[in-house]
Amino acid sequence: MGRIVLVVVIAAAWLLGSCTTAMPPPPPPAGRPAVIENSVGMSMVLVPAGSFRMGSDEPIERLAADFPRYEPERLRSIDDEAPVHEVRITRAFYLGRHEVTVGQFARFLAESGYVPESVADGTGGYGFNPAYDPSLTPRRDAFEGRNPAYSWRNPGFAQGDDHPVLNITWNDAQAMARWLSIREGRRYRLPTEAEWEYACRAGNRTRYQGGDHPSVLLRTANTFDRDSARHWPKWRDDASPGADGHPFTAPVGSFAPNAWGLHDMHGNAWEWVADWYAADYYSRSPVNDPTGPLAGDVRVRRGGSWHSWPFYLRASFRNWNTPQTRYTLVGMRLLLESEP
């Protein structure tokens, strides 16, 4: 019993020591509302122009101490988060308060006639199947696929219209942004990687909104926790602390927003961003409004998902896939450019 109490006390001290005071949302620029609702019911939050320090320079030794289950080689592989560098976002923009939902994506398909790639190419997507054994497959992937049984309609578990849409490709996300742009006569797009991290941090330098310790995720993010671990017992020791009642996706907005009013910037669904990926891009990134490499093979996704462990939910963590990838963890959040 004494050991349990000591662990709790240490964790609490760590949490309190790692928290910083969140920056309050700045007043909106003159003439621009702080929040707008678009023609398909998306709530868009005005993100101000400003500067921030992008990336992470945490020493490997600290990461190894804080995430002891991760192999040193895995920790060394995140050198793409460095160097920490100054970024200036020169124009305010509107960003979706929530990830794009199943219902919003369904409306896009119904009104545009667009066919998502998981359906158009006949190969489907990925999904959860309790009878599927990852150890029997060459990739040892946690999910079954590709399989035509899975798509944005069916990730292998029940979703309501208010859950984040999954199994969409980067190209699908681009198509929805183009459709909305034509429909409303103003430009929608995916955020750049820099815009995404700027909005995620909302003025903070901590790993997660609210602090550095994974315990803060319980109220702010839908992650791989004890509820999810019931379906993947071999990964129970990697789960986030606690249980949030959502073993799979949660309705968007179920968890506390960050300081600028954005929900699910950590967890629920990985979010495609606009940039091509390059491991060394931060060493040559311009200060003003970086947009990533001019070309590449894979596009960046950010934020982690309902199936992510705390290490991968950090604000600085970068991941990537080909633009044609569709997966039961990956969705999107759209940006609306604000008029000057």
PLM features per residue range, with description:
Residues G2-F143, W170-N171, R178, N204, ...:
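Short, compositionally biased
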